[in-house]
Amino acid sequence: MTEILRIELVSVNPESLEKVSRMFKEIADKMGVRVKGPIPLPTKRLRVTALRNPSGEGTNRYDKYELRIHKRIIDIPNPDERYIRSIMGITLPDDVKISIVLM
């Protein structure tokens, strides 16, 4: 039975997300571990519309705010223990959240 190590990266900054996913892929290439990904998932957009004027008068008086959440998935079939230990030592930027699951 094959095990799959799934790494899910989430960030609002796409540049730092790409940098971290590149680091995971480079470590896997150095150790000779096979990697599937990074697979980009659809970007979630959180939108908030707020009325500028509290009195309610005026037509085009709205502020629109948007937050985009980017996700990447990296799958590693049959992960090596050395690879798992080496990715645990990576320092991540503050805006990148990571989830590691062994399936």
Swiss-Prot record:
What are the recorded Gene Ontology BP terms? translation
Keyword check for Ribosomal protein? yes
Top-rank lineage group of the source organism: Archaea
Q: What is this protein called?
A: Small ribosomal subunit protein uS10
Q: Does the keyword Magnesium apply?
A: no
Q: Which gene does this sequence derive from?
A: rps10
GO CC term (a single one): cytosolic small ribosomal subunit
What family does this belong to?
Belongs to the universal ribosomal protein uS10 family.
Which InterPro entries does the annotation name?
Answer: Ribosomal_uS10, Ribosomal_uS10_CS, Ribosomal_uS10_dom, Ribosomal_uS10_dom_sf, Ribosomal_uS10_euk/arc
Q: What does this protein do?
A: Involved in the binding of tRNA to the ribosomes.
Q: Which organism is it from?
A: Korarchaeum cryptofilum (strain OPF8)
Ordered alphabetically, the record's keywords are: Ribonucleoprotein, Ribosomal protein
Task: Give the quaternary structure.
Answer: Part of the 30S ribosomal subunit.
What GO molecular function annotations does the UniProt record carry, in alphabetical order? structural constituent of ribosome; tRNA binding
